[in-house]
Amino acid sequence: RQELKQRVLDELEKGERKFLIDFSQTGYIDSSGLGVLVSLSKKIREQGGELRLANLNDDLKTLFELTKLDTLFQISDTRERALETF
């Protein structure tokens, strides 16, 4: 979590404004992980950027729906679909 957060913040500092996190290798995320995503999304939006998510499994999709975080993030089924509209 901290590694991801620091990496994104470093890229934001360098001027990057478009971020995509691919969850294809992620089966589970806990509440602190969700908190990191929300925090990153806020910081990125404050700088005029956007954070998108891709390749969430069914359990993660359900988690994002139950926590209403699906309204905060643009979630795509594939990396390609997420990148098409960036």
Predicted segments, located by residue:
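Amphipathic alpha-helical interaction surfaces in cytosolic regulatory modules
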Residues: R1-F73
